Amino acid sequence: MFALRTFAVLFASLSALAAATPLDARTNPTTTVTVTAPASTATVPAGQCNVSNQQCCNSVEKASSGPAALVLGLLGVVVQDVNVLVGLDCSPITVIGGGNGACNASPVCCENNSFGSLISIGCIPISL
């Protein structure tokens, strides 16, 4: 009988403790991104961009625009300069692989702030 009461008290105590534990800190981490490239709509030659940073993006927008802000929010990314350009749905521009360095969308040079091919932060348009 004593063991049953001890178990009941222990179970009730642990249940109350689990219910009082906040989940927000574990489930919603944020990432702050500081972009060193200025927000620019000027086009620069591809030769001024590191080859590994050249991207072909389906859309290039300011971080404050609707689609970009939505993706950044869902990823938990906070961009300090909301006027910085971000590329959405990007892929690397490479000569290897038969692409001949071509881009049928928006060629940009982005900092190494990317989240897969979903979004690249700190982009500047380039001319190929």
Swiss-Prot record:
Keyword Disulfide bond: yes
Compartments in which it is found: Secreted; Secreted, Cell wall
Major place of residence: secreted
InterPro entries: Hydrophobin
UniProt KW keywords: Cell wall, Disulfide bond, Glycoprotein, Secreted, Signal
Signal peptide region: 1-20
Paired cysteines (S-S): 49-109, 56-103, 57-90, 110-123
Molecular-function annotations in GO: structural constituent of cell wall
Coiled coil region boundaries: none
Assigned GO CC terms: extracellular region; fungal-type cell wall
Pfam families: Hydrophobin
Superkingdom assignment: Eukaryota
CDD domains reported in the protein's UniProt record: hydrophobin_I
Induction per the UniProt record: Expression is negatively regulated by the basidioma development repressor lfc1. A CT-rich motif, which is often found immediately upstream of the transcription start point of highly expressed filamentous fungal genes, is present at the expected position.
The protein's role, per its UniProt record: Aerial growth, conidiation, and dispersal of filamentous fungi in the environment rely upon a capability of their secreting small amphipathic proteins called hydrophobins (HPBs) with low sequence identity. Class I can self-assemble into an outermost layer of rodlet bundles on aerial cell surfaces, conferring cellular hydrophobicity that supports fungal growth, development and dispersal; whereas Class II form highly ordered films at water-air interfaces through intermolecular interactions but contribute nothing to the rodlet structure.
Complexes and interactors: Self-assembles to form functional amyloid fibrils called rodlets. Self-assembly into fibrillar rodlets occurs spontaneously at hydrophobic:hydrophilic interfaces and the rodlets further associate laterally to form amphipathic monolayers.
Similarity comment: family membership: Belongs to the fungal hydrophobin family.
Protein name: Class I hydrophobin 8
Taxonomic source organism: Flammulina velutipes (Agaricus velutipes)
Taxonomic path: Eukaryota, Fungi, Dikarya, Basidiomycota, Agaricomycotina
